[in-house]
Amino acid sequence: RDSSTSRGLGDVYKRQGVISTAQIGFEEPDFVGNEEACNLRSIRKHIVRAKELASGKGMIAVNVMVALQQYREHVKEAVRAGADAVICGAGLPVDLPELVEAGKAKIAPIVSSRRAAALLLKTWDKKYGRTADFIVTEGPEAGGHLGFSREQLDDISKIRFEEELTGIMEEKKKYEEKYGKQIPVFAAGGIWDASDAKRIEALGADGVQAATRFVATKECDASLGYKKAYVNAKETDVKIIKSPVGMPGRALNNAFIQKTERAPESVERCYHCIKNCKPAQIPYCITQALIRAVHGDVENGLVFCGSNVGKIDRISTVREVIEDLMYEKEVKMP
């Protein structure tokens, strides 16, 4: 994910940018009590705006969490609004081909293991006669929700992610042959610069996906306080948490995390975000926590981040980050 909403995406310069649809309508004036309509309205608004800023070049995709109550509606609205691709994680999107008519937009899962990729590709093939247009393989150093167990993440050195990545590339071959097309694989999680991109692509991957560095850019529409939390973070400030979503995640170990680990925060209302959420049993409302943080109240909110956040020492630009990820530094973007 290059940036969360349309303003940053217009500056991704002829490459792929990804909009996250999770509670995307939070800045709409009527969001509270009207979350579903605001989210759908904002999906369209941000896709249209991103395409305008990109002048029709590159690809604008959306990331839709399978765990969302509005998962199916978000996917359908993104396609109607003209998204070039729909990428789904936080659960296996077994029904994604049903929601996206062939030829309308590309479809791609986010997976963290060969086993998950094999299951999904087999299901899509048998049930829908379709296959993935590309695959995002997310490793254990990514930010936000992670497709690994808490026990695995307690010692990521034991996770053989490169083996999983090469296994996924092997798994897709039979479907490439059957459907007569290439299925590119993009690796995500812990991608910092061109050396990481080279290492990943040397394994056979087609490219990388990066997110954390793009938060600390001038173009990102998060508050200055949120960006400064990234800039000021040290490696030791990062922690694996248990999210109200029910999955482990990587976030800054700030005052909010420490407080809610000692005692749950009262949940005053439901924002209808997660399918299986039980407000009386969760440590805090993830929607409220994320909104507080992105507005700048970072010590009272949830700040997701990747493992490399401690390397960020300033607020840069989208151009600088992309050039850092490119192989040839002497080749500048137009």
Please describe what each predicted stretch is.
Residues 1, 15-19, 60-64, 86-88, ...:
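Hydrophobic faces of well-ordered beta-strands that scaffold small-molecule active sites
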